[in-house]
Amino acid sequence: MGQEKKLALITGAGRGIGKVIALQLAKSGADIALTDLNPELEDLKSELNKLGSKCLDFQVDVTDPEAIDKMVSEVVGSQGRIDILVNNAGITQDNLMMRMKAEQWSKVIDVNLNGVFHITRAVLKTMMKQRSGKIISISSVVGFSGNPG
């Protein structure tokens, strides 16, 4: 990761892929800003601290641009930078599309697409000032293979 310690901001970090990414980046020497809709991030934060990572945690809904802007301001105010953004927050509706309600579809689009837009836009300002940064967006394999009906 180079000489200077990096700061990684990870959405959907509470479990699964986001949690594993947080642990791996901490093992690589990064400090971590965890975000998740679920407020229970204390155990992961403790694990990351044991790995030598400074860790901030935020309960944030990625569909709320004002909450995202506030969180990004807090991260930059505290850490001075954001070097890596991992867009990992996402939801699925376990239903065939032909049975899915419009509200369910709208929620998927709001979290999985609009959420990525909101947080990426908020973080880009900082990365452009730094003249550096990496953005990684996680998506589903279903985007390549599709699902029936």
Regions found by a protein language model. Name each.
Residues G2-A33:
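Canonical Rossmann dinucleotide-binding motif of NAD(H)/NADP(H)-dependent dehydrogenases/reductases
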Residues A30-D43:
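Conserved glycine-rich Rossmann-like NAD(P)H-binding loop of the short-chain dehydrogenase/reductase
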Residues Q59-M71, A102:
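The beta1-alpha1 cofactor-binding region of Rossmann-like NAD(H)/NADP(H)-dependent oxidoreductases
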Residues L96-M97, Q104-I109:
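Substrate-binding pocket helix/loop in short-chain dehydrogenase/reductase
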Residues M98, S145-G149:
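Active-site loop immediately N-terminal to the catalytic Tyr-X3-Lys motif
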Residues S140:
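Residue(s) in the substrate-gating loop at a strand-loop-helix junction
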